[in-house]
UniProtKB/Swiss-Prot annotation:
It catalyses: tRNA(Ala) + L-alanine + ATP = L-alanyl-tRNA(Ala) + AMP + diphosphate. This is Alanine--tRNA ligase. Its EC number is 6.1.1.7. Catalyzes the attachment of alanine to tRNA(Ala) in a two-step reaction: alanine is first activated by ATP to form Ala-AMP and then transferred to the acceptor end of tRNA(Ala). Also edits incorrectly charged Ser-tRNA(Ala) and Gly-tRNA(Ala) via its editing domain. One of its GO terms (cellular component) is cytosol. InterPro entries: aa-tRNA-synth_II/BPL/LPL, Ala-tRNA-lgiase_IIc, Ala-tRNA-ligase_IIc_anticod-bd, Ala-tRNA-synth_IIc_core, Ala-tRNA-synth_IIc_N, Ala-tRNA_ligase, Ala_tRNA_ligase_euk/bac, DHHA1_dom. Consists of three domains; the N-terminal catalytic domain, the editing domain and the C-terminal C-Ala domain. The editing domain removes incorrectly charged amino acids, while the C-Ala domain, along with tRNA(Ala), serves as a bridge to cooperatively bring together the editing and aminoacylation centers thus stimulating deacylation of misacylated tRNAs. Binds 1 zinc ion per subunit. PROSITE patterns: AA_TRNA_LIGASE_II_ALA. Keywords: Aminoacyl-tRNA synthetase, ATP-binding, Cytoplasm, Ligase, Metal-binding, Nucleotide-binding, Protein biosynthesis, RNA-binding, tRNA-binding, Zinc.
């Protein structure tokens, strides 16, 4: 693969120039709610640029997995219809953190363009900011001035946000020649097809204030990004990114599966959509995301449904995406081993989602017919209906428009676009970063805390800051609530699913009860609580003491959580991925990927494996290691989405080996005993196990034993005969229910004999209007079904009953009358509209309700009048 060669040579080039090669971060940022997906190489370095995080390296290079399919950067609707839009792409980049600046960045970029990308220097152009004389002068060493262009803020100024680090940027472009257009320079190339931008160099040299002023940064940074797929297309000389390398391989696989031939014109859009989307979906699932109904999961579901809709154009009527994934793993698995490691999980998730959506599409097709019918008076599909078809059933708006055109219908696009924009705003609102006053205060403190809590549960230290009611204060008085920052702290701050410590901070002047501990930013430990007696002031010498008994229970539960995770993997398979966890002093909660409920036998096996590890009482080994040494180890579990520092902690307990920053038991035997209390689904493809340990586990067993004893007493049998007695009792109940059903059916048939005798006939059609007593309302459907079985042709029935203070109405029409244009839902519309009622259903059967109804005789006359209008 050409992409593998370019990626490898790019990283090697910068590694040979003292850059640290770092792995790609996941496709979603773990601690940055301001963006849905990782959309640039600099995302993982954001805290470094903001001076919130210190690292051991000053130069770095990466190939970053990116997704642009939500929020501000959303290319989803363009994919398949343009030459280069993608939802998934790789961003090659080099970064300098206060090290080199413009001169070196430009020199490196020029050398890479010639020696790694092998571009003809005569085809390279550069743009700079109109005020960046320095960059212009630097480029003059490599390019003639007529190939360097000055542009405005719109094109050549980069900022992270409205305030903060920002700076000029310089873009590199390559002239692909006259076959890509007649533009004579990048300024004339309005669609950017001939002079294709392939690299952006960002020079962070300013700090924008809230007033809009640009102040020089004390440390200047470099952030560059070059799209790998675009580079491959340029080097291979293809017209689009889809005609070379990985994407062409995926298109070829889709050709094989569909039996159709790809063409690079508009007719090939379906192939391009599938090739791109299967990459986004596969990488997202491998990184721990799953399709869902909110936020990132909702975007993944939209991507998958868009893939399926385009797949249907190629003739796919059953799940097919999973069959393409092995080709992707073969092409990119060497660079991204998570694709191969998660292959079965990716395929399972895709297949389950596709199966679900194909069922939804069947309903959607019926809905479209109903929409067309309900819009018959205006010959226009409403914006609300169009949006529902797109948002709920995944039908692209262009497909809705085409289908509407087939029936000479139009679509209210103005309302549709308005609703779509409102939905985008709601989605964006869910993920927009909301910084509370307290968080802003913590950022202003410019403090860090030294954590010593792995080895010490108490220490003498100093108070560095106090916060109360969102203000920095100098002291806290008795009964006041607030937060304290210490210079040195033994308190573990909540993170990684483990709750923060509690305890006390005290001196002779006062005592502060710590209820919980957090870390609002890297390196800062904040102790929350209240003054129980006396007062405490900033700079006071104090003793910090963790509640050691609570800490021990938390540590035991955290180690048990690791053992549980390993037991799940052993019992259920290597597709298991942690999707979330919560550990405190009373319980364990572990969310994980698994497509179905766990059987009682497997739950018992999981519980047994954990307790076996506990009984072995092996020491829990915790060691520090360089992340670069362990990041590719298949034995050591790490969690995609977590951001790891240069040095990590490897926690080994029994057969479990995980990267973890939490606190743990000294030996597995400290856990005592493990008991699962609950297993259930929390989302599609996500299961949750809840468990307890130690004394809590023993108490749970005792409680369950007491319940069994009570049941045995009620059944008047020994405990070992409970199951057999209940089985016999339930069998007896089934027989009684069967006899009761037979009796009720006999009574229904007897009643139907009378009802049939009272049916009215006109024009060869049999009609019945009947009111059921309220005590029979649960048999409304049964009466209607039985009557239509007895009289299968030319029958219309209307049934009413009462329930919870309102009238329920059911209409049913025989199949032969449906073909003549008589429909059950239309009958209810005629009956219930004058009553202020509501209804819904299908042609054969429909049901509705109303606050009041006319007498049965009036309904009977209404029915015949309506029939006469239908059969004219």
């Amino acid at each position: 693969m050409l992409s593998n060669t370019i990626r490898s040579n790019f990283l090697k080039f910068y590694a040979n120039r003292h850059h640290t090669i770092l792995p790609s971060s996941p496709v979603f940022p773990h601690n940055d709610p301001s963006i849905l997906f990782t959309n640039a190489g600099m995302n993982q370095f954001k805290d470094i640029f903001l001076n919130k995080e210190k690292v051991s390296y000053s130069r770095a290079t990466t190939s970053q997995k990116c997704i642009r399919a939500g929020g501000k950067h959303n290319d989803l609707d363009n994919v398949g219809h343009t030459s280069r839009h993608l939802t998934f792409f790789e961003m090659l980049g080099n970064f300098s953190f206060g090290d080199y600046f413009k001169a070196e960045a430009i020199a490196f970029a020029w050398e890479v363009s010639l020696s790694v990308f092998n571009f003809n220097p005569e085809g390279i152009y550069a743009t700079v900011h109109e005020k960046d004389d320095e960059a212009f002068a630097l480029w003059e060493a490599y390019l003639p001035t007529d190939r360097i262009f000055r542009l405005t803020d719109k094109d050549n100024f980069w900022s992270m946000a409205n305030t903060g680090p920002c700076g000029y940027c310089s873009e590199l472009l390559f002239d692909r020649g006259p076959s890509f257009g007649n533009a004579s320079s990048p300024l004339d190339d309005t669609d950017g097809e001939r002079f294709l931008e392939y690299w952006n160099l960002v020079f962070m040299e300013f700090n924008r204030t809230s007033e809009g002023s640009l102040l020089a940064l004390p440390n200047k940074h470099v952030d560059t990004g070059a799209g790998l797929e675009r580079l491959v297309s340029l080097i291979a000389g293809t017209h689009t990114v889809f005609e070379a390398d990985v994407l062409r391989e995926l298109i070829a696989k889709t050709e094989q599966l569909s039996g159709k031939v790809y063409h690079p014109d508009d007719s090939g859009a379906a192939f391009r959509v599938i090739a791109d989307h299967v990459r986004s979906l596969s990488f997202a699932i491998a990184d721990g995301l799953l399709p869902g109904n909110t936020e990132r999961g909702y975007v993944l579901r939209k991507i998958l449904r868009r893939s399926v809709n385009y797949g249907r154009r190629l003739g796919f009527r059953n799940p097919f995406l999973a069959e393409i994934v092995p080709s992707l793993a073969d092409a990119m698995g060497e660079a991204y081993p998570e694709l191969k490691n998660s292959l079965s999980q990716i395929q399972k998730v895709l297949t389950l989602e596709e199966e679900s959506f194909f069922k939804t599409l069947d309903r959607g097709g019926n809905l479209l017919q109903q929409v067309l019918k309900s819009s018959s008076s205006s010959s226009c599909i409403s914006g609300e209906d169009a949006f529902k078809l797109k948002d709920t059933y995944g039908m692209p708006i262009d497909e809705i428009s085409l289908l509407a055109k087939d029936y000479d219908y139009s679509v209210d696009m103005d309302t549709f676009h308005k609703l779509e924009q409102e939905a985008k705003e709601r989605s964006r609102k869910n993920v927009v970063q909301s910084q509370g006053t307290s968080e802003s205060i913590y950022n202003e403190l410019h403090l860090t805390s030294e954590f010593i809590g792995y080895d010490h549960l108490s220490c003498d230290t100093f108070i560095e800051a106090i916060i109360s009611k969102d203000h920095i204060v100098s002291s806290l008085q008795e009964k006041q609530e607030g937060a304290i920052v210490l210079k040195v702290s033994p308190f573990y701050a909540e993170k990684g699913g483990q709750v923060g410590d509690s305890g006390e901070i005290f001196c002779s002047e006062g005592t502060f009860i710590v209820t919980h501990t957090t870390s609002p930013k890297a390196g800062l430990i904040v102790h929350h609580g209240r003054i129980s007696q006396g007062s405490l002031t900033v700079e006071a010498a104090v003793t910090a003491q963790v509640n050691r008994y609570r800490r021990k229970r938390i540590a035991n539960n955290h180690t048990a959580c690791h053992l549980l995770h390993k037991a799940l993997e052993i019992t259920l398979g290597d597709h298991i991925r942690q999707a979330g966890s919560y550990v405190d002093d009373t319980k364990i909660r572990l969310d994980f990927t698994h497509p179905q409920a766990i059987s009682p036998e497997d739950l018992l096996c999981i519980e047994t494996l954990v307790n076996e590890s506990i009984r072995e009482n092996e020491p829990v080994d915790i060691r520090e290691a360089l992340y670069s040494d362990v990041m590719n180890s298949s034995e050591i579990k790490q969690f995609f989405g977590d951001k790891y520092s240069d040095v990590v902690r490897v926690v080994s307990a029994g057969h479990s080996h995980e990267l973890c920053g939490g606190t743990h038991a000294e030996a597995t035997g400290d856990i005592g005993f493990f008991r699962i209390t609950k297993e259930h689904a929390v989302a599609m493809g996500i299961r949750r196990i809840e468990a307890v340990t130690g004394e809590k586990a023993e108490a749970t067993v005792h409680q369950q034993s007491e319940v069994l004893e009570e049941i045995a007493t009620l059944l008047q049998v020994p405990r070992d005969q409970i199951v057999s007695r209940l089985t016999a009792t339930l069998d007896e109940r089934k027989q009684q229910d069967k006899r009761l059903n037979e009796l009720e059916n006999s009574l229904i048939q007897t009643k139907l004999d009378k009802l049939i005798h009272n049916c009215h006939q006109r024009q060869g059609i049999t009609c019945l209007v009947h009111h059921l007593a309220e005590h029979e309302n649960h048999r409304l459907q049964q009466y209607a079904q039985c009557l239509h079985q007895r009289i299968p042709e030319k029958l219309i029935s209307l049934w009413t009953t009462e329930k919870n203070g309102k009238y329920i109405v059911l209409s049913r029409v025989s199949d032969d009358l449906i073909t003549q244009g008589v429909h059950a839902q239309d009958l209810l519309k005629a009956v219930l509209t004058p009553c202020g009622g509501r209804w819904g259903g299908k042609d054969q059967s429909a049901q509705g309700s109303a606050p009041a109804l006319p007498a049965t005789e009036v309904l009977n006359e209404t029915l015949w009048q309506w029939i006469s209008t239908q059969l004219i």
